[in-house]
């Protein structure tokens, strides 16, 4: 959870996105089918329990515990996958509602119940982060820790953030990660080390250039590349 605006291009910070014409930010574009298909294959299950995912899990939990209000606060975990954080937070006494776009993730979340005997979620529902079926000012905190990097268009990202802000009670907290525009370039040049040849691929470098200029990570067609 970086200590910066979730919308770095907006000098007035996240609250300023509530200004202006509503029609400008209506969520009309569906999430890319490739993204949804991937999650419906269960690719997220177990990711946080291996490799660098272990660091992500531990650090995220640390930051959440530092900043969340005390239980039994109402938390909405939007785009929360199969509920790794949702179930953990519920075990701490929070009233947790889990939402995810992938039906498979919601089904998988039921499997975690066995790891938390006597614990339950208030809800586990399929929905879009830009249209959450809950009343305004009904959550003490919203976790929006997955959806934004799957929504490359600025207006659609704003729609997702506006929806989270709508749900928050006055003084509520919104948690969302930020990914540096240099992430793909750093991934290519450090994770694979000296054997990596991605920076010699035109398609890869075009993708990186777009990330650095527009802040949008748009993968080339699968036939061209695997990244």
Which sequence ranges carry the predicted segments?
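Acceptor-substrate binding/catalytic loop of class I
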Residues: 151, 219-227
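A short glycine-rich, Lys/Arg-flanked "PGG" loop and its adjoining helix->strand segment in the class I
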Residues: 158-170
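Class I SAM-dependent methyltransferase SAM/SAH-binding core
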Residues: 76, 84-131
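A short acidic, Gly/Pro-enriched loop at the edge of an enzyme's catalytic core
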Residues: 130-142
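A short SAM/SAH-binding and catalytic strip from SAM-dependent methyltransferases
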Residues: 141-155
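Conserved class I S-adenosyl-L-methionine
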Residues: 24-79, 84, 88, 173-209
